[in-house]
Amino acid sequence: MDNMNHEELNDQLLVRREKLHNLREQGIDPFGKRFERTNATNDLLSLYGEFSKEELEEKEISVSIAGRIMTKRGKGKAGFAHIQDLHGQVQIYVRKDAVGDEEYELFKTADLGDLVGIEGKVFKTNVGELSVKATGFTLLTKSLRPLPDKYHGLKDVEQRYRQRYLDLITSMESRETFVTRSKIIREMRRYLDDNGYLEVETPMMHAIAGGASARPFITHHNALDMELYMRIAIELHLKRLIVGGLEKVYEIGRVFRNEGVSTRHNPEFTMIELYEAYADYKDIMKLTENMVAHIAKQVLGTTTIQYGDYEINLEPEWTRLHMVDAIKEHSGADFWNPMSVEEARELAKEHNVEIKDTMEVGHIINEFFEQKVEDKLIQPTFIYGHPVEISPLAKKNDEDPRFTDRFELFIVAREHANAFTELNDPIDQKERFEAQLKEREQGNDEAHMMDDDYIEALEYGMPPTGGLGIGIDRLVMLLTNAPSIRDVLLFPAMRHKQD
């Protein structure tokens, strides 16, 4: 469609509307009724692809298929077309003497993009292409707009995202990506259900934006006359359920963060969060690597995948590396010995690590990791032992309380999961929230708000608990070799189209 000028496009629109008018004049419904299919295109290939031309002629197999006309050729009393459904394409052969004058005229005047139903016999052409010889041809939906150029598809990447329906029509690869996405989520559910987890649903609108460090979307409830926040995480409601005795829970759902758009970020995205009573972050590490490997095996048939230039091995057990050791390995800076914030700032200056004046030692450690280590983590790696300053909901490590029992999973230099042994001490939790409030006062609008109701829930007693969050969109990117998050979201966030 990029190659057409407006005049050509308008001509095509007019011609198709004239055809629509003619169909109605003839008493033919251009937007037809239910059509019963016996087979999808991939069924035909798997069931009959191995038969010879002669065997198919002898068997006289009758089928009924439906789909969109993608190619069409032929003149006179016979013609060929390719019909596309969700699973692929199959060729049809339409002869005037086989379908009759009226139906052949329908075929002759059909346009690329029209949706049709075909009844006929399976056969092979002289060059061996499995096809359907039509005995009936039904117009199901008249297409009033021409499809993008079949040889070039949608060249404009932005148009692919804005008009995803055209992308799905013209790109088999795109269709396969979204079918795979559905399978990934299905296998994730199956794995957790089979391991005794209970799927639950919790509110998407919260009185307090909690469970993550992020800027929320704010909305207003008219009847209650109160501000609400679209959830930035699922966490705190699920942990209330752990308090209530639901010992293994998970939720797959949308999360909203009022932040930038990039190849890795969309303002609304899909997460899974899960929590298990009487477990810790080490148990959750095992669960994570086993679940991701299971999904890869079931959906892709392998745990060795290609992402960009990298071959990634998802077979457990994955590398486990303390954040401080990772920093020492990749930069030489050693944070194991306790130090003052002035010493940490001097170290940052020495290693050209950019920091803000308000940062404490833990924040500086995290900046070292993000600037010196993160882009080196290609194979699956659990980075654990995050500083307490950046982990307000994680339990302190017993041996070194400067750090927490928390991990993040990195693959191809991207964070794919975040998990901890959950903080279940209500007094410590309140102190952490208060420290976060001070950060908000200093200008960090992503710092956690105080949540007194959650503190009260913890005061009733939450068992030792391991929790996990995985960004499903990024996992789908990894398993489908997609370079951008927009390639795995059916309708990604876009700016208003400029006229």
From Swiss-Prot:
EC number(s) from the headed UniProt entry: 6.1.1.6
Residues that coordinate or bind Mg(2+) 2: E415
Residue numbers binding Mg(2+) 1: E408, E415
Pfam families given in the database record: tRNA-synt_2, tRNA_anti-codon
Chief location: cytoplasm
Keywords: Aminoacyl-tRNA synthetase, ATP-binding, Cytoplasm, Ligase, Magnesium, Metal-binding, Nucleotide-binding, Protein biosynthesis
Subcellular location per the Swiss-Prot or TrEMBL entry: Cytoplasm
Record text on cofactor binding: Binds 3 Mg(2+) ions per subunit.
A GO MF term: catalytic activity, acting on a protein
Source organism superkingdom: Bacteria
Cofactor: Mg(2+)
GO biological process: lysyl-tRNA aminoacylation
Enzyme class: ligase
NCBIfam families from the UniProt entry: lysS_bact, PRK00484.1
Classification via PANTHER family: LYSINE--TRNA LIGASE, CHLOROPLASTIC_MITOCHONDRIAL, LYSYL-TRNA SYNTHETASE
Family label: Belongs to the class-II aminoacyl-tRNA synthetase family.
Name of the molecule in the record: Lysine--tRNA ligase
Organism: Bacillus anthracis
Recorded name of the encoding gene: lysS
